[in-house]
Regions:
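C-terminal non-catalytic regions of proteins with extracellular/luminal or membrane-system context
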Residues: 1-10, 29-42, 54, 83-221
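Residues at alpha-helix termini
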Residues: 18, 37-38, 59
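Metal- or metallocofactor-binding catalytic centers and their adjacent structured scaffolds
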Residues: 77, 81
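Conserved, charged catalytic cores of large soluble enzymes
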Residues: 50, 54-74
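Short acidic/histidine-rich active-site segments
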Residues: 1-6, 14-26
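Charge-rich, acidic-biased intrinsically disordered regions
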Residues: 69-76, 111-115
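A local structural micro-motif
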Residues: 23, 42-43, 64, 154
Length: 221
């Protein structure tokens, strides 16, 4: 996918030599061929295995009373874990540019416009390698919950995430005028674009054939 190697054994050998001791996919199934072709040595494989199992033993995975085998289901989505998840989400936010806009003061705002294909899309929240939560809160829902009845919240999807129209019988850009109207009637606009797991993920980005991406005019692609 990255055009660095030409075969799977070459990829496996390169990864092992660069210190990648474990692979969750199927690339390391080609390590034997890489060894037979002289791309790696038995010592390379032994070193990776020793480091991997040293870590697993230090974590206690092979202890007689391994704590990971006795985690009760009751702790799933418990208040403590939800609080930790929320804290992790807060700390992971990256603010690239502000110019004094944030934080928003709802006491000074009468109308908030929320625009974008990911503004009210749960698929954009879950990523890949995910479990199933009992509740999802989209950006639109989060803003609505926070401001309550104090601030009016307008919403426009604006565009489809990767098609040129939202409605099958619509014309290209069929929701763009709605987005413009929402923006004109809002004191501040929260624009939510980006991708979701239908368009990006492990070994997916390179083969994305729909040409999707963020465009200044909301027309995707």
């Amino acid at each position: 996918h990255h055009h660095i190697t030409t075969t799977a054994p070459e990829s496996a050998a390169l990864a092992i030599k660069m210190g990648c001791d474990v692979n969750c996919g199927n690339t390391y199934l080609h390590l034997l061929r890489a060894l037979e072709d002289g791309l790696i040595t038995e010592d390379d494989i032994t070193t990776a295995a020793e480091r991997l199992f040293t870590t697993r033993f230090m974590l206690g995975e092979f202890d007689e009373n391994c704590e990971y085998n006795s985690i009760p289901y009751e702790v799933v989505e418990c208040p403590e874990h939800l609080a930790l998840s929320e804290e992790a989400a807060r700390r992971s936010v990256v603010l690239l540019k502000n110019d004094g806009i944030l934080p928003l003061d709802k006491a000074k705002i009468k109308t908030i416009g929320v625009i974008g294909p990911n503004a009210n899309d749960r698929m954009a929240l879950i990523g890949n390698y995910h479990g199933t939560a009992s509740r999802y809160i989209t950006v639109l829902e989060g803003i609505q919950d926070y401001v309550g009845d104090d601030v009016r919240v307008l919403y426009a999807e604006g565009c489809h995430l990767y098609k040129d129209r939202v409605e099958g019988l619509g014309l290209p850009g069929d929701r763009l005028s709605e987005a413009e109207t929402v923006a004109e009637h809002s004191d501040v606009v929260v624009l939510v674009t980006g991708l979701n797991e239908n368009l990006e993920g492990e070994e997916m980005d390179q083969s994305n054939s729909v040409g999707s991406g963020d465009k200044a005019n909301l027309l995707l692609p």
